[in-house]
Structures are given as C-alpha cells and as structure tokens.
Amino acid sequence: MVKLRLKRYGRKKRPFYRVIAIDSRCRRDGKALKELGFYDPIAGKTQLDVPNIIFYLKAGAQTSETVGNLLQKAKVFNQLSLLN
C-alpha cells in the first residue's frame, strides 16, 4: 500500500520535511516513489504538488495523520471532492 508521509531532513533541532509517496513497508527515510512537496515547521512554509497528490489519493494512497492535517490546511481534500 502506498502512503503519503513525511521524510525528515535538516539538522539537529532544525527539522525540515518532504512530503513523499512511499510504500508503507519502507522505513521513514527510505527511497520515495515520488516527492510531492515540502513542509518547514520552523518557518511555517508548505509547498505541495497538488495534482500529483490528488493522483495518488485517487489511486488509493493513505495519508499519515500529519500529512492529512497539512492537506486539510491546503484544502486539497476540497479540490479532490470537486473533481469527483
């Protein structure tokens, strides 16, 4: 099963995350199928590749809790429901 989750980058005490599509059996920082954006909690910046995220969600991908919250803030689920 494919999951949309965060992959940690950055240095100690300065996290930076990439939103990725990955097989659920792989480890957190394993090889991603596709990178779909980034999230910087320190600066409060988020950039998402919405068309590819919608593609993976339509294909049955599950989101982690944190990525789900990010997608709700970016109103991706609203766009997904409008497309159906």
Curated annotation (Swiss-Prot):
Cellular compartments per GO CC: chloroplast; mitochondrion; small ribosomal subunit
Family: Belongs to the bacterial ribosomal protein bS16 family.
GO molecular function list: structural constituent of ribosome
Compartments reported by the entry: Plastid, Chloroplast
Superkingdom of the organism of origin: Eukaryota
Pfam families: Ribosomal_S16
BP-aspect Gene Ontology terms: mitochondrial translation
Higher taxonomy: Eukaryota, Viridiplantae, Streptophyta, Mesostigmatophyceae, Mesostigmatales
Gene assigned in the entry: rps16
Keyword terms: Chloroplast, Plastid, Ribonucleoprotein, Ribosomal protein
Principal cellular location given in the protein's record: plastid
Protein name in the entry: Small ribosomal subunit protein bS16c
